Curated annotation (Swiss-Prot):
GO terms for molecular function: rRNA binding; structural constituent of ribosome. Residues 23-33 have a biased composition (Gly residues). It comes from Xanthomonas campestris pv. campestris (strain ATCC 33913 / DSM 3586 / NCPPB 528 / LMG 568 / P 25). Pfam families: Ribosomal_L27A. Residues 1-64 are annotated as: Disordered. Residues 1-20 have a biased composition (Basic and acidic residues). Keywords: Ribonucleoprotein, Ribosomal protein, RNA-binding, rRNA-binding. Part of the 50S ribosomal subunit. The lineage of its organism: Bacteria, Pseudomonadati, Pseudomonadota, Gammaproteobacteria, Lysobacterales. Belongs to the universal ribosomal protein uL15 family. This is Large ribosomal subunit protein uL15. InterPro entries: Ribosomal_uL15, Ribosomal_uL15/eL18, Ribosomal_uL15/eL18_sf, Ribosomal_uL15_bac-type, Ribosomal_uL15_CS. Residues 34-47 have a biased composition (Basic residues). One of its GO terms (cellular component) is cytosolic large ribosomal subunit.
């Protein structure tokens, strides 16, 4: 027996008919159509509530006080770690040299050297701030800090 295109049919359970709601009590999905009585889920567009909405209660983000701020000083200044300095060639280092070595972002207007790691080269810092620990490490390596 040969098979024809009109003999093809989908596998059992592969295609189901769309459930029709609101078509009488006998269907099991009449009247309220499976949505229950009242409430947001019974309404059209129901269940779509804003993030943070707590049903009319003052939401958490309004109950808690504002804290902190973003310093404008931090935006204009940059930190350079002492072990990053060690990757540069020994000698004079100023703000322009740090920027040329990509150790300082372009938005920064000033930089500060912070101690982290060890210094083995002799550096002379000019016009760049340094913490007390970084200053001591630079001087211990034979360098100096000129503000």
């Amino acid at each position: 027996m040969t098979m024809h295109l009109n003999d093809l049919k989908p596998a059992d359970g592969a295609r189901t008919e769309r459930t029709r709601v609101g078509r009488g009590i006998g269907s099991g999905l009449g009247k309220t159509c499976g949505r229950g009585h009242k409430g947001s889920f019974a309404r059209k567009g129901g269940g779509k509530i804003k993030a943070g909405f707590e049903g009319g209660q003052t939401p958490m983000q309004r109950r808690l006080p504002k804290i902190g701020f973003r310093s404008k000083m931090a935006r204009d200044s940059a930190e350079v770690l002492s072990y990053q300095l060690d990757k540069l060639e020994a000698g004079e280092i100023d703000f322009a040299a740090l920027r040329a070595a990509n150790l300082v972002p372009s938005r920064a207007k000033k930089a500060k050297i912070v101690l982290k790691g060890e210094l083995s080269k002799k550096f002379v810092l000019k016009g760049v701030a340094a913490t007390a620990g970084a200053k001591a490490a630079i001087e211990a390596a034979g360098g100096s800090v000129e503000e």
